[in-house]
UniProtKB/Swiss-Prot annotation:
Transmembrane segments: none annotated. GO terms for molecular function: ATP binding; protein-glycine ligase activity. This is Inactive polyglycylase TTLL10. The gene is TTLL10. Inactive polyglycylase. ATP binds at Q362, R363, Y364, I365, K375, D377. Residues 8-36 have a biased composition (Basic residues). PROSITE patterns: TTL.
Amino acid sequence: MDHSCTRFIHRRGPPTRTRAGFKRGKRPRIQQRPRARVSGTIPASRLHPAPASQPGPCPAPGHCPVGPAHERPMGSSQEEGLRCQPSQPDHDADGHCGPDLEGAERASATPGPPGLLNSHRPADSDDTNAAGPSAALLEGLLLGGGKPSPHSTRPGPFFYIGGSNGATIISSYCKSKGWQRIHDSRRDDYTLKWCEVKSRDSYGSFREGEQLLYQLPNNKLLTTKIGLLSTLRGRARAMSKASKVPGGVQARLEKDAAAPALEDLPWTSPGYLRPQRVLRMEEFFPETYRLDLKHEREAFFTLFDETQIWICKPTASNQGKGIFLLRNQEEVAALQAKTRSMEDDPIHHKTPFRGPQARVVQRYIQNPLLVDGRKFDVRSYLLIACTTPYMIFFGHGYARLTLSLYDPHSSDLGGHLTNQFMQKKSPLYMLLKEHTVWSMEHLNRYISDTFWKARGLAKDWVFTTLKKRMQQIMAHCFLAAKPKLDCKLGYFDLIGCDFLIDDNFKVWLLEMNSNPALHTNCEVLKEVIPGVVIETLDLVLETFRKSLRGQKMLPLLSQRRFVLLHNGEADPRPHLGGSCSLRRWPPLPTRQAKSSGPPMPHAPDQPGARRPAPPPLVPQRPRPPGPDLDSAHDGEPQAPGTEQSGTGNRHPAQEPSPGTAKEEREEPENARP
């Protein structure tokens, strides 16, 4: 038998149905047909599809698709009932014909129709009147294997919002940029993804340098009770070891510990977290014990006495759920018996992940500063706008008050917890809800009128002493977690920080919360929250764009109310497989370094010009160019394949990846006592 003959296997029955749907992780069958080679310009039949009643001719013999996909081409305006028109190309300063990337700055730009391949890469974040892609760009994408988004016929860029927390503000902001919202959480062709609850799928499919993703993967180092406690303890141990080095920097800084007043201590200029005094954990964080560790649990049960009140909180809860006070031995004994019974339960040992949530007990501050007899705390914001390099900001928030008068011995949690969820349980909430939230200006006026002369406070104490103290505490917490935080270009986070002031005007950090509440159910919140969200997104987009291009971060044109705490351009540079290395971000020299080898291309002297980086210390992998989110004040758009004028012969897209992010699922904002 001749085995060289080709054998054909025929299937019986009707032919296999061609599915037009999209299966995740695989290309649709309708897109696997051979592409027609395009030479010169794109045929008019591709740019001007024939009406549905008069099907047009096939673009090339032998490649005429059949079925619904041919009758309604993917990505064409025919599906949306729009008239197909050729794109209007725009010419930049270099004569390059391409899409308009300066829509927000060019008022004269003429908008074009949705393009066939406009979703190949997200458009400019500030582009509200962007023109459609030119024919030359479409041809280049076709020859290069570009294809439209298999999910939608609209051009994009796309954004996804998971949950309702701040969704209206975020959606309005993105739509004002010309972005379009998607509602499928499984899609990975987004430019911005903002979710209340973290999902490992989001981090697994995240494309560094191409997308923006809200919440750092391991922000639990700061935003859970146990995470924050462990982070601060680790920082304290490191500082203790450093202080024992004779003549060390920390040893000299520890000499300032006996300073009588914190406001008299020196503090460096904003933007560089190099405090001249090391904070001690016990100075701003209440004494706390972990109940999931036996030795800490037993230590707490031993030291407890009825002269102090303690508060027990789950490590990652929200809305005050699971919080209760410990005032007497009976309540502590009940808690001790419950923890022991759970520890002895064999089911808990077999499936510890199904056990109850870990808890902490924290010394309750019994002497809070009162406002008209009511307890209050201050919500401020820590913004991580960029992680490569780190750009950290402080933002003012508002004051939250209880409706009930403060009584330390009361069993009503509404008089102890200031969050809106607890206050809504009061029957008087709808009548007095405007009294549960104060602006920082209102709080400053009250403290100045009530305590300024009587207590000898500084003028405008809220905006001077309190502001500086909160910035110092935030800086300390960030520096403690910084070596362990996952950093990739495109990660950003907005963290809510809750501070309590006691009657001695000492400031305490209660907790830090992921996914802070962005609701606007009060007039003060309607004034504060939108500004916080809008400036957050503005700073995220600007720092992302500058980091991608390798430009200097400062000045930041979108910075308004947020205060810069840390500019990480001098920090260790991220590398493959980790969050930091010994490399630093390349300096910004005023003249080119001498070299014995062949001369290197000279970068023009303009803002953002940088010297080519030295050879990498670790193997690097190329990264595809991300979305061009620039605006007109940052320079003209570059042609595909060209270099940025401010980066020498090194393209900013060739940055190393900082490694794989840890994946987890967290609950939204924690409760705030």
